[in-house]
Amino acid sequence: TLGAPAPSVSFFAEAITTNIIRQCQRHEIPLPRLIIEPGRSIVARAGVALYTVGVVKEVPGVRYYVSIDGGMADNIRPALYGAKQEAVLANKMRAKEIGKFTIAGKFCESGDILIRDIALPQPMAGDILAVPGCGAYCLPQASNYNASFKVAVVLVNEGKARLIRRRETL
């Protein structure tokens, strides 16, 4: 989740080893070898999900919805456990924010909401919505829900882009 600091390795090490040592002593068993997979703290910032804006719809007196060409099949975290994410319109980085918008996925599910009430410049069909902080769990948790295809992956390094996984097809 963007903005939420990942717990440090030393935080985890202290919390886990203290309990393991105590329990091993209590049960008179030898200490095991401990290996920690730091996950999010290493790769979360390495991934940015890019979506194309479709329809922008106003529900009078309620809110504005921005539909995108992805959703809960490629980023389940907001629907599954309420992960909070940020986003920008990549092609309007210098434009002034004009209001709050709710980013809705393409699946016909009431829970397919990526971000609620985010301040953005005026979104229009064809704009590119960039969601940072997607490197840790979006790809491993992606599914083929509702017959959707898993997304392509592009590696960008030193100003050069390379397709490293094609989008799925039939």
Feature-to-residue mapping (PLM):
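Charged (often Lys/Glu-rich) extended helix/loop segments that serve as interaction or gating elements
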Residues: A15, I29-L170
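Alpha-helix-loop-beta-strand connector modules within alpha/beta enzyme cores
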Residues: F12-C24
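Active-site-proximal beta-alpha loop/turn segments in soluble metabolic enzymes
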Residues: T1-V9, P38-I42
